[in-house]
Design a protein with these regions (language model features):
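Short Pro-Gly-centered flexible turn/kink motifs
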Residues: 18, 101-105, 212, 216
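A conserved, well-ordered hydrophobic junction motif at loop->secondary-structure transitions
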Residues: 44-63, 172, 179-230, 234
């Protein structure tokens, strides 16, 4: 039997705004996310509701918009069996409150033709109940086998260069737990690839893999702790490319290096010698 032909993408969706249902959350939602990205007892400001000035890690920005991103991909005709999360960006305009109601919109801003694959770029904005802009995110999703439709290839990622010979701003090593993907999925990313051993093996992995956004959240958390003095409001933006797979239970080495722009850092992460986050750029106040 011949495999089914890839579905044609609905390019008419490009530029259209999609509304997400209101997202109601409380401190437990935020603490669950913090645990999913490795927070421990020394970070009670992110975990214990009794802490004065309870904090929320900036990576939480992806949580209220996961549904609208999946909806956009479904409407455009992406084949969910072949999706690969390529890049992620967040821009934080104000810290998340410990509880509240969030209203988000999404928009497919571009579809790039990479030949064998298409890259769907989705932008989201999130406002609080008072209408104040809290966060924006950009998701770049590779749709393997759905390129070749005659579109523009789009830009190629360019790595921000660190200052030559400058010492790192910081290095950090974080040990993911064997249960890390099981914890992270409680924040709403329920892709069975991260929990089902049979599925993971069937698509070519040794075991269920860690969510890319979990590794991204670990990195954003480290930036807040090491460069932001533990203040989430100081991380203004963070973008990174997912360059390799992380398995739960492995150790990840992160490095941030200064650039020629004050407050801007080049970021990458490795498992051993293997790059897993690349083209990282963080901006802090």
């Amino acid at each position: 039997m011949q495999p089914a032909a890839p579905q044609t993408l609905n390019l008419d969706l490009v530029g259209r705004t999609l509304e997400a249902p209101e997202f109601t959350y409380d401190w437990k939602t935020c603490a669950t996310y913090a645990l999913g990205i490795g927070a421990g007892p020394e970070e009670l400001a992110y975990l214990w509701e009794g802490t004065p000035g309870f904090h929320v890690y900036p990576g939480f920005a992806v949580v209220p918009v996961q549904g609208i991103v999946m909806d956009a991909l479904a409407r455009i005709g992406a084949d969910f069996r072949t999706l690969v999360h390529g890049e992620q960006t967040l821009r934080l305009h104000r810290p998340f409150d410990r509880a509240g109601v969030l209203r988000s919109t999404g928009r497919v801003s571009a579809v790039h033709d990479k030949g064998k694959a298409a890259v769907v770029v989705i932008d989201t904005t999130t406002h609080d109940a008072n209408g104040q802009l809290v966060a924006e995110t950009t998701w770049s999703i590779f749709c393997r086998g759905q390129g070749g439709f005659g579109g523009e290839p789009g830009p190629s990622p360019v790595a921000v260069q660190p200052l030559p010979d400058a010492p790192p701003a910081f290095t950090a090593q974080f040990a993911t737990q064997s249960t890390q993907a099981l914890l992270y999925r409680l924040s709403g990313d329920l892709n069975p690839l991260h929990v089902d051993p049979a599925l993971a093996t069937r698509v070519g992995f040794e075991a269920p893999i860690l969510h890319g956004l979990c590794s991204y959240g670990f990195a954003a958390r480290a930036l807040v702790l090491h460069l932001g003095g533990g203040d989430p409001a100081r991380l203004r933006s963070f973008s990174a490319r997912f360059s390799g797979v992380v398995y739960p239970g492995t150790i990840v080495d992160l490095v941030a290096r200064p650039t020629d722009v004050a407050g801007r850092f080049a970021v990458e992460a490795r498992v051993g010698d293997r790059l897993v986050l690349s083209h990282g750029v963080a901006e802090l106040a």
